[in-house]
A protein has these predicted regions:
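Gly/Pro/Ser/Thr-rich low-complexity, intrinsically disordered segments predominantly at protein N-termini
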Residues: 1-150
Length: 150
C-alpha cells in the first residue's frame, strides 16, 4: 500500500453512502480504508453461494445465523461483504450493528474472477482482525482453500 493514500473509515464510508455518493446498484466494500469495487455476480458464483448456504443451513440449523453478501465490520477501516458469513445468533438479527470478528465463526468467499484478491488481500484483512476460520472456494479450479487460526 502506498504511504500517501488517505484511508477512509467505516463511519466515513457509511456517511458517503447516506449522502448518495455511490450509485445504489454499485457493489462496493471497504477493505483497509480503500473502497473496492466488487466483480459482477455470475451464474456459477450465485449457484455456488446457494448450494453452500443450503448445505450449511441443513447441517447447522438454528444454532447459527448464515448471512449472504452482508457486511461484517472487521475494524475501523474494513467492512467487507463476504459471500457467506456464519455468525452467532443475535436477538435483533444484527439490526443495531454489523457482526464483528468476535461474533463470526466462519467467512467464505466464492471465487471465480477474484481468486488472487480473495487469497491475498482478504486473507490478510480477515487474519489481522482475528477471524478464526476463512475459506475460499475456487469454483473454476474446484478447490477449497482453508485459512484457520491466523
Amino acid at each position: 500500500m502506498l504511504t500517501n493514500i488517505r484511508q477512509i473509515t467505516v463511519n466515513e464510508y457509511h456517511q458517503m453512502a447516506e449522502m448518495g455518493i455511490f450509485h445504489p446498484e454499485e457493489r462496493l466494500e471497504l477493505i483497509s480504508g480503500q473502497i473496492i469495487k466488487m466483480a459482477a455476480k455470475g451464474t456459477a458464483h450465485e449457484a455456488a453461494i446457494t448450494r453452500t448456504q443450503r448445505m450449511l443451513n441443513q447441517r447447522l440449523g438454528d444454532k447459527v445465523l448464515i448471512r449472504t453478501q452482508s457486511p461484517i465490520k472487521l475494524d475501523d477501516y474494513s467492512e467487507p461483504e463476504p459471500d457467506i458469513a456464519v455468525v452467532k445468533t443475535n436477538v435483533l438479527d444484527y439490526e443495531d450493528h454489523h457482526p464483528q470478528p468476535s461474533e463470526v465463526f466462519l467467512v467464505i468467499e466464492i471465487a471465480d474472477s477474484s481468486l488472487k484478491y480473495d487469497r491475498e488481500v482478504k486473507t490478510l484483512a480477515y487474519a489481522k482482525s482475528g477471524i478464526i476460520d476463512y475459506w475460499v472456494l475456487d469454483i473454476n479450479g474446484r478447490k477449497l482453500y482453508v485459512y484457520r487460526l491466523p
